[in-house]
Amino acid sequence: MDGGAEGSQQPHLILANKLFLLTHPDVPDIEKVQLKSEVLDFIRSHGMAPLYETLIASSVLDLDQSLLESMRAANEEELKKLDEKIADAEENLGESEVREAHLAKALYFIRISDKEKALEQLKLTEGKTVAVGQKMDVVFYTLQLAFFYMDFDLVSKSIDKAKKLFEEGGDWERKNRLKVYEGLYCMSTRNFKKAASLFLDSISTFTTYEIFPYETFIFYTVLTSIITLDRVSLKQKVVDAPEILTVLGKIPFLSEFLNSLYECQYKAFFSAFAGMAVQIKYDRYLYPHFRFYMREVRTVVYSQFLESYKSVTVEAMAKAFGVSVDFIDQELSRFIAAGKLHCKIDKVAGVLETNRPDAKNALYQATIKQGDFLLNRIQKLSRVIDL
């Protein structure tokens, strides 16, 4: 994508977030009025006729025929100039200048949000590119375009292409940037464990400011780590990480969310959790997984609480979390039924009894299950052979 000073988020991805909020069911109408004005101003200043037409068709924006026609005319004029530069480069200059002229046209299509023509022109530019590093840059432009449209099929294919390019060479700076792109892809497709691993690997080398600021990166790193790391790893890699500590306090509720969980301050955790929920709900990458993530966090915190007890009263647990007995009873019933918690409720006594399997028992049960599966496969195979 074009624009965006070094070290700042691409303007198009800021626009993408505004478009997400503009169509979000929970954003108040008064805020949407301001968002609509900001979106229209951005489209007008960047001459984004193709995007404007798409948003009109989906009833996000209203049609202003004169604006649309003026943007179309400006697009045609600029594309004519770019084609003239390509022709001049092909006639009078070298391969490097030809490539740059084609890339300029690709970036213009990205700027005006003409996705299909941008991809076509990026492919053409890639064909005129020799250096692995420059080929990687074309992939990064494609990834930014794909994240703008939330086209995860294109993201996946582009990441695979980048990894193949790295087999031919490539520098560490670009390899580290790719980890963040892949981490964002994994988080956006609900692979939180891999996302956390990739984000944690990138903390000390983060330079991917074009897709989000460093604070947002830390926000995602903490969120994905909390539901995927054990306590020891969480302490080593997140709670005590200097890079995280430097910005943790700048992100509302995040410090309380992380530290109260680790320090078993459950009432404070639930208070911070409510604040975090709002931020997750208004994040374009996390919103589709909002309910899933909220369940996973509660599974982690309830499991951690119960880990310390063989039995505990429901009332004591409710008090620890600062909620009513009825609430915690309903919560636990759902989580136990879903197989998320290893305990049972004695309704008469109002007591929770844990029955979590130890590591040896878990391994034993898994071995039996795998053995039964193997035996069934052998029996099916023997019947086929007998026939």
UniProtKB/Swiss-Prot annotation:
The keyword Coiled coil applies. This is 26S proteasome non-ATPase regulatory subunit 6 homolog. Residues 65-101 form a coiled coil. The keyword Zinc-finger does not apply. Acts as a regulatory subunit of the 26S proteasome which is involved in the ATP-dependent degradation of ubiquitinated proteins. Component of the 19S regulatory particle (RP/PA700) lid subcomplex of the 26S proteasome. The 26S proteasome is composed of a core protease (CP), known as the 20S proteasome, capped at one or both ends by the 19S regulatory particle (RP/PA700). The RP/PA700 complex is composed of at least 17 different subunits in two subcomplexes, the base and the lid, which form the portions proximal and distal to the 20S proteolytic core, respectively. Residues 191-359 form the PCI domain. The modification N-acetylmethionine is found at residue 1. It comes from Arabidopsis thaliana. GO terms for cellular component: cytosol; nucleus; proteasome complex. SUPFAM superfamilies: Winged helix' DNA-binding domain. InterPro entries: PCI_dom (IPR000717), Rpn7/CSN1 (IPR019585), Rpn7_N (IPR045135), RPN7_PSMD6_C (IPR049549), WH_DNA-bd_sf (IPR036390). Gene3D superfamilies: 1.25.40.570. Keywords: Acetylation, Coiled coil, Proteasome. Ubiquitous with highest expression in flowers. GO terms for biological process: protein catabolic process. Belongs to the proteasome subunit S10 family.
